């Protein structure tokens, strides 16, 4: 059985990688799909191409994981790919309420099942938004993101990191 792991991945975090790595042990193939999210329009730090490149680098050691992108309804993408399972990571109960609603809708309109994977406890506080904020101040992020994301964030916020490194 194959699955799709969708998200905006702006950037991919260690929490994403934890869920993805565990999903890669559960499914024959997992397609990490960078989705266009209309609610996040204009709020991405990284371009689509940058996010795809970061993900390709971060997932290079996972042979049954491939990276793709899509703009549209997730259930349409899942059907086009011949998949029937969506993987979603959960950090807290508040994530579950929202994800449960989406899972029910996806099953109703696309006959797609959703598998929830709880983030490891030590990643439950990590979000892409928080990582970007910490990075924007030159803070330490190496434990919260894979090396590819850290390098990309350091490039985006080079001026801030250069000042901290010189101090």
UniProtKB/Swiss-Prot annotation:
Database matches in SUPFAM superfamilies: Nucleotidylyl transferase
Gene Ontology molecular function terms on file: ATP binding; pantetheine-phosphate adenylyltransferase activity
Gene3D superfamilies per record: HUPs
Subcellular location: Cytoplasm
EC number: 2.7.7.3
Pfam family, any one: CTP_transf_like
Residues that coordinate or bind ATP: 8-9, 16, 89-91, 99, 123-129
Coiled-coil stretches noted in the UniProt entry, renumbered to this chain: none
KW ATP-binding (keyword) present: yes
Cofactors named for this entry: Mg(2+)
The UniProt record lists the keyword Nucleotidyltransferase: yes
UniProt pathway annotation: Cofactor biosynthesis; coenzyme A biosynthesis; CoA from (R)-pantothenate: step 4/5
Residues involved in substrate binding: 8, 40, 74, 88
A GO-annotated cellular component: cytoplasm
Catalytic activity of the protein: (R)-4'-phosphopantetheine + ATP + H(+) = 3'-dephospho-CoA + diphosphate
Site (Transition state stabilizer): 16
GO biological process: coenzyme A biosynthetic process
Source organism, top-level taxon: Bacteria
InterPro entries, per the entry: Cyt_trans-like (IPR004821), PPAT (IPR001980), Rossmann-like_a/b/a_fold (IPR014729)
The protein's role, per its UniProt record: Reversibly transfers an adenylyl group from ATP to 4'-phosphopantetheine, yielding dephospho-CoA (dPCoA) and pyrophosphate.
Oligomeric form and interacting partners: Homohexamer.
Protein family: Belongs to the bacterial CoaD family.
PANTHER family, A to Z: PHOSPHOPANTETHEINE ADENYLYLTRANSFERASE
Listed name of the protein: Phosphopantetheine adenylyltransferase
Organism field: Deinococcus radiodurans (strain ATCC 13939 / DSM 20539 / JCM 16871 / CCUG 27074 / LMG 4051 / NBRC 15346 / NCIMB 9279 / VKM B-1422 / R1)
